[in-house]
Amino acid sequence: MMEDNKSNTYTAHPSGGEKGEGLDIHSFDEIRPYEPEEMPVVFEELLNDRQFNLVMKGFTPWLPKSVRNGLLRLLFKGVKSSQDFQVRFMKPVVRLSIWRCTNGTTFGCPEDFNKHGRYIFLSNHRDIVLDSAYLDLMLHDGGFERTCEIGIGDNLLIYPWIKKLVRMNKAFTVRRGLTAHEMMRSSMLMSQYIHFAVNEKRENIWIAQREGRAKDSDDRTQDSVLKMFAMGAPDFCNDNIIDALRHLHIAPLTISYEHDPCDYLKAEEFQFKRDVPGWKKSKEDDLLNMKTGILGKKGRVHYELSPCIDAWLGTLDRSLPKKEIFRLVAEHIDREIHSRYRLYPCNWIAMDELDGTDNSDKYTEKDRKEFEKYLAGQMAKVRVPNPDTAFLRERMLTMYANPVRNYLTAVKERNTEE
């Protein structure tokens, strides 16, 4: 694999500490993915981890541990970087997931998109694990020079072997559940790392447009994500938000799943939050969401890449207040994402039922019956003690209707601008 790292020392934005503070790769040891020289040691630690071996035994119960680990060591030969690890180990796993759990994946990007550049792919969020995994496969198969480093919340890294595995797979850690002071420091460090990764390590980054998945599929870019991007920019950006964001080469990305296997779990959350004051998800809930998302049926899956927003950012008035700039950038990213949804019959059916509209030219009676059967099957999985059937159904329908609503609004706004 091509390695074009040119990292040595990086000058941080003065708000990260003392002005001109020099940062190198080891400044980010607490959050960064593993470097090539660390991979062999960590791989051996994985093979000696009891819980990891139990998981591997579940996949190949007929193989003795010594044989299984011997085969894994053989596969690891020649792995010199995290990208090599992705191609050797993760690519076959992701292909298996696509074969078993989808009705096919497709990927689109502008014809003139520079596949040798480095970007932040900022997307809506559908699955905790697979959003970035599918993207990496699509980028690799689509001729992009690099796959992505990804941000993953430490609330999901509940076992040491999981943390090791994701860091081998180009993941950096996003810390959750912090105090306000800790959050400021953590956000600054992550921002500095993202700038460092894109411009010094020469890596692509995938990150979601908001913290956590939008439970109702109303995908909106959080200002806080854009503020985090800007806060760790290098000195030469001179505290200018537009220059700071252009330094990251943000390319909006739209992810469209025909079916969300976690839709019934999200509906459950809505009822629990409505009925149980102070209810919060447990670690077990997070694990169930991860497992359901990975193993559940998704139907058709489509990824659509938008043009990098650097040129558009250059048209903004630099004298605008920061708050206004963040608002305009978030709205532009949302329009790019919303206008590129791949809409399926179930989306139109859901909106018609909720809004009383008639888009029957977008689906057949067979489509409607199949979606009704799908909803009934998902509703049967609900674990709420006293399920409010009407409420749960409305919540699930909303998840499928919102992409259509946002798509229609975005297309109308774009046509008005033109």
Predicted feature locations:
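Soluble catalytic domains of membrane acyltransferases
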Residues: 11-12, 90-310, 314, 381-385
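Short, highly charged low-complexity linear segments
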Residues: 193-195, 287, 365-378, 398-402
